[in-house]
A protein has these predicted regions:
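A Rossmann-like FAD-binding core segment of flavoenzymes
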Residues: 97-109, 114-117, 125, 204-299
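Glycine-rich dinucleotide-binding loop and its adjacent helix/turn
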Residues: 134-209
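FAD-site-proximal beta/loop scaffold in flavoenzymes
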Residues: 148-176, 270-318
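Cleavable N-terminal signal peptides
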Residues: 15, 24-26
Length: 318
């Protein structure tokens, strides 16, 4: 993993890296940078573009939500180590302290030829450079039976929002000795250790409140991130509570049924009292709308994070 310092990040996304010509400032034109997506990546990019350029860039952040709940630390909330409010953040300080224009609207599409972002309200934002931090979109149809409706009883909790609360509440209300079933996503996906961190935090909660309960992880993968560390930790802290089953053991995930709370594999059917089902993923929809995707993801030039499809668009995130 390559670690980028704050100074390095600012250099990576500085005016020169974005290809913005500073001589134009002599004629009074301030280059415009629009950032779409106010999650960790987009908000950080907007902050340091504005801060490190010292007014040389006109930075606008487009984010539909007025409050952002982080996916990271949501597992600590589920486990009882943090309050839900602690993972929520508004954009007031970001806007005021860094002189960023924050627009709380949906970005509907991007016209790369005209260098324009089209807002759902009908408004338009012009740019010299565009930074996309699109997050992820869920491929619900990657698991038969899973859908936006199914997530009401089998939440994924893989995008910011209230589903972390839903998962915690379902765990707290499980019957004594009940079964929690987790279905992690196939590669590639956001935060590779995340499903196993979540299983650990749910085990911590159950150990305190429902110690005879069981967690079954039905994994489509043969191995997972930091597998040795997680399995050793489970055996040490939650012996006998977490059972991880790979495809060799279950034969493959066939379908889920949110009404009966059943997960069907090739070799068996698992009945859950509570469940977390995380489907396959792709780049967020705005990346497709901007024309920078190839299949599910958005190829970039690593040195500058510029899109291979459009040199005036930089893509970052998961």
């Amino acid at each position: 993993m390559t670690l980028i310092s704050r100074r390095g990040f600012g250099g990576l996304f500085g005016a020169s890296a974005l290809g913005l010509a500073m001589p134009s400032l002599a004629f009074g034109a301030v280059p415009k940078v629009v950032v779409i997506g106010g999650g960790a990546g987009g908000a950080t990019a907007a902050r340091y573009l504005a801060k490190d350029s010292k007014g040389a860039l006109d930075v606008t952040l487009v984010e539909a939500s007025k409050r952002y709940y982080t996916c990271f630390y949501s597992n600590l909330y589920i486990g009882g180590f943090r309050k839900y409010g602690s993972i929520g953040h508004n954009y007031y300080g970001l806007a005021v302290n860094n002189r960023i224009n924050v627009v709380h609207e949906w970005a509907a599409s991007v016209d790369g030829a005209a260098k324009t972002v089209n807002l759902a309200s009908g408004g338009k934002l012009s740019y010299d450079k565009l930074v996309l931090s699109p997050g992820i979109a869920l491929k619900y149809d990657s698991i038969a039976g899973y859908s936006p409706q199914a997530q009401g009883r089998m939440p994924h909790g893989w995008t910011s929002g209230t589903q972390a609360q839903q998962i915690r509440n379902q765990v707290l209300t499980m019957k004594k000795g009940g079964t929690f079933v987790m279905v992690p996503p196939p590669n590639p996906y956001r935060c590779p250790p995340g499903p196993y961190e979540r299983a650990s935090m749910i085990a911590h909660l159950l150990k305190e409140r429902n110690p005879t309960a069981k967690i079954i992880v039905l994994d489509p993968k043969e191995k997972f991130s930091k597998m040795g560390l997680f399995t050793a930790g489970w055996e040490k802290h939650y012996p006998g509570m977490i059972e991880w089953l790979g495809p060799d053991a279950h034969g493959g995930i066939k379908s889920v049924n949110h009404e009966t709370m059943e997960i069907v594999t090739d070799l068996d059917t698992f009945k859950a009292d509570a469940a977390c089902v995380v489907p396959a993923q792709r780049a967020g929809s705005i990346a497709t709308a901007a024309g920078v995707t190839d299949g599910d993801w958005a190829p970039i030039i690593p040195a500058t994070m510029a899109s291979k499809a459009d040199p005036n668009i930089h893509v970052l995130g998961d």
